[in-house]
Regions:
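A polyanion-binding, active-site-adjacent surface
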Residues: 1-121, 125, 129-169
Length: 169
């Protein structure tokens, strides 16, 4: 199974539609890539009733509510971590997590009671986690990151290729 962990609901995305990355800029690259690698039946998601079906994957966020100024506070991240911890506990052994950005990366580590020092964030990096879980890091697919070329479509697809290969082992 494949769990994608984002930052928080976007104002024009999940906060408005109820589905993570649906209807916002970050979702454009995410859903296109999910489709390309066989994790969804549609190439895009603009609204909840669009018949999107995710295949062997789920999308969640480190923070569950819309943060002020689109950046969650340390307290919001901490308060929501118990929900992420619960979601991770439900994963079967051998599942793969994708951390979209440093905040999601750190939230996953906190949920698993792991230290950030031992698991440094780096785009495309693979981390072995307890319970035979694996985490991959990626820069967040935000408008800012894609427009500044911090994250390109090719870079994002390379991480998904690693994940797809991991899941096919």
């Amino acid at each position: 199974f494949f769990l994608i962990v984002g930052l928080a609901p976007g104002m024009h995305g999940a906060n408005k539609t109820g589905r993570p990355f649906t209807g916002d800029h970050a979702g454009i690259l995410l859903y296109k890539t999910l489709y390309k690698f066989g994790f969804s039946n549609l190439e895009s998601s603009q609204f909840v009733g669009d018949d999107l079906i995710l295949k062997n994957c789920r999308i969640t966020n480190a923070v569950k509510c819309l943060p002020p100024d689109n950046k969650p506070s340390h307290e919001e991240i901490k308060n929501c971590n118990k929900f992420l911890q619960f979601e991770i506990k439900l994963l079967k052994k051998g599942s793969v997590l994708l951390a979209l950005g440093l905040i999601a990366h750190n939230a996953i580590l906190t949920a698993l009671n792991l230290t950030k020092k031992e698991y440094k964030f780096s785009h495309g990096k693979r981390h072995n986690l307890p319970n035979n879980l694996v985490m991959y890091d990626s820069y967040h697919c935000s408008r800012y990151n894609t427009q500044t070329k911090r994250l390109t479509e090719q870079m994002f697809e390379e991480v998904f290729l690693l994940i797809k290969n991991e899941m096919e082992r």
